[in-house]
């Protein structure tokens, strides 16, 4: 996302746990940042108008870390949040990830910040890793289908939204977009695709 936006000449602040790992891009400034650290997050977001918020790493404290970041953004004066959420986000979901994203969305709605929620589906890049060492995909999928989306497509979509906002376009204010792939596949069909690509059953 940062590289897409940088090609459009937008000034960027990159909040990172380790600023030394920031990509070397013109007109970009790396700031030390940590999920769950309110003071550090406020400092990193000082002067930021639009925050692109990606979820924290999976952990028992992820939900609270998200809420801390939302609070920090509000206190720091961030005007808009573009939040990378999840396609099935819902408070009553049996899927922990979906509940966490729904709680985060609600917290953002309760602030004075404008928001855009990008609810992406499962990443297609993840599908190659879902089989275990024996080549078995184990999970409660049954006959369910999923339209996986490429991380590259999600990054491009996020960059397009943020660039629009930076140009003063308000059409994305308080909007929710669901990002999916073009094909809805069962896990049996996904397994067949992986077999064709890798040559392994």
Kindly give the residue locations of the regions a language model identified.
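Cofactor-binding loops of NAD(P)H-dependent oxidoreductases
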Residues: 31-33
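Oxidoreductase cofactor-interface core, primarily capturing Rossmann-like NAD(P)-dependent enzymes
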Residues: 1-25, 36-39, 46-48, 57-64, ...
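Periplasmic-binding protein-like
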Residues: 52-54
């Amino acid at each position: 996302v940062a590289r897409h936006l940088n090609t459009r000449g937008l000034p960027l602040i990159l909040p990172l746990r380790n600023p030394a790992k920031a990509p070397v891009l013109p007109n970009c400034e790396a700031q030390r940042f940590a999920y769950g650290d309110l003071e550090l997050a406020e400092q990193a977001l000082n002067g930021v108008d639009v925050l692109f918020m990606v979820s924290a790493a999976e952990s028992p404290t992820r939900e609270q870390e998200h809420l801390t970041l939302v609070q920090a953004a509000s206190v720091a004066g961030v005007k808009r949040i573009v939040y990378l959420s999840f396609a099935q986000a819902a408070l009553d979901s049996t899927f922990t990830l979906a509940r966490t994203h729904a709680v985060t969305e609600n917290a953002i709605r309760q602030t004075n910040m404008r928001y855009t929620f990008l609810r992406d589906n499962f990443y297609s890049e993840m599908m190659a890793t879902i089989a275990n060492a024996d080549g078995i995909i184990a999970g409660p999928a049954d006959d369910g289908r999923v339209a996986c989306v490429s991380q590259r497509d999600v990054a491009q979509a996020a960059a397009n939204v943020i660039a629009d906002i930076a140009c003063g376009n308000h059409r994305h204010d308080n909007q929710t977009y669901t990002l999916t792939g073009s094909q809805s596949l069962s896990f049996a069909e996904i397994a067949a695709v992986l077999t064709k690509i890798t040559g392994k059953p």
